[in-house]
Amino acid sequence: MTSRNYLLLTPGPLTTSRTVKEAMLFDSCTWDDDYNIGVVEQIRQQLTALATASEGYTSVLLQGSGSYAVEAVLGSALGPQDKVLIVSNGAYGARMVEMAGLMGIAHHAYDCGEVARPDVQAIDAILNADPTISHIAMVHSETTTGMLNPIDEVGALAHRYGKTYIVDAMSSFGGIPMDIAALHIDYLISSANKCIQGVPGFAFVIAREQKLAACKGHSRSLSLDLYAQWRCMEDNHGKWRFTSPTHTVLAFAQALKELAKEGGVAARHQRYQQNQRSLVAGMRALGFNTLLDDELHSPIITAFYSPEDPQYRFSEFYRRLKEQGFVIYPGKVSQSDCFRIGNIGEVYAADITALLTAIRTAMYWTK
């Protein structure tokens, strides 16, 4: 381990500002009103406001990574007679399928392949053929490949068929403008350490209050009972059922202030988009090819094919980049040899320029 700080070019955890880190220097009592009412309740209100201006939505914070919240939603939102259609085109859609299977939740997995955009007509046909489906769940920004999925079109289907709509917006909420009411989303799931630019430690769910209120008694887990967590926060003014990750929460409160200072989600989206476009242009100039076509890319993370040169090893490429202060991500695509570069967090145009220079230096197989 080294004391040197790297620029994390990953989809989260990501590079955070010094002020977000410094917010964690304060110790809070989990029973204190200054913390629960002054911090937690403020966060809940701000998250709901970021998601939509429409009435009837609420938010719940939950200890753990984003996957904990995904499992909490699946395990709480679906009753014993319900069935979920899971749209999957990557590791995180597949993870939802695995969760549903382990919890004994009836589900239909529509897997369209890792590099294919979900076919909305195929989803329509599935819904038309199976009236027992009560819920639809999908990932928005699938970081396996960097693909941005059509949550608007699927949301329109969910609304037309009267289905409850669950969206894993882990790597998009706070970085891509959206109105969850207009998108017909009933449950949106995200995490502290993604586009809001906080640190790991908790996830959150922004939900239609009427839907959440109907979840009582559904949960397959004590600690992942979304309804019970929500009622505790509602009835006790921000109190968590079990130990709150206080330092992470304080960091997140600071991160929300910095999001507002940047100009909100629209301004952050613009920065991320420019980062991603500059990255792709620079990588192509160096001879790298993207896994996806441009129209499929999210502004969050990009997958690049590994060089075909027999000398190339990702581990050596990674080491050489890390020596220069940059950390990238290995590939997660099962059918292609790739690596991934994220461009969210405290990453700006100058950082992308510096990264491209470092990559040129690290391309030992071209020497």
Curated annotation (Swiss-Prot):
Q: Could you tell me the Gene Ontology terms of the biological process aspect for this record?
A: organic phosphonate catabolic process
Q: How does activity depend on pH?
A: Optimum pH is 6.5-9.5 for phosphonoacetaldehyde formation, and 7.5-8.5 for 2-aminoethyl phosphonate formation.
Does Glycoprotein appear among the keywords? no
Q: Which InterPro entries match?
A: Aminotrans_V_dom (IPR000192), NH2EtPonate_pyrv_transaminase (IPR012703), PyrdxlP-dep_Trfase (IPR015424), PyrdxlP-dep_Trfase_major (IPR015421), PyrdxlP-dep_Trfase_small (IPR015422), SP_NH2Trfase/AEP_transaminase (IPR024169)
Organism in which the protein naturally occurs: Salmonella typhimurium (strain LT2 / SGSC1412 / ATCC 700720)
Q: Where does pyridoxal 5'-phosphate bind?
A: 65-67, 92, 143, 168, 243
Question: Additional comments on file?
Answer: Maps to a phosphate-starvation-inducible locus previously known as psiC.
Q: Which family does it belong to?
A: Belongs to the class-V pyridoxal-phosphate-dependent aminotransferase family. PhnW subfamily.
Which keywords has UniProt assigned to this entry? Aminotransferase, Pyridoxal phosphate, Pyruvate, Transferase
- List the induction conditions: Induced when inorganic phosphate is limiting; this is controlled by PhoB.
Keyword Transferase included in the entry's annotation: yes
Supply the name of the protein.
2-aminoethylphosphonate--pyruvate transaminase
Quaternary context: Homodimer.
Q: Which Gene3D superfamilies match?
A: Aspartate Aminotransferase, domain 1, Type I PLP-dependent aspartate aminotransferase-like (Major domain)
What cofactors does the UniProt entry give for this protein?
pyridoxal 5'-phosphate
Q: Which gene encodes it?
A: phnW
Cofactor binding notes: Thr-243 of one partner binds the pyridoxal phosphate moiety of the other.
Q: According to the UniProt entry, which residues carry N6-(pyridoxal phosphate)lysine?
A: 194
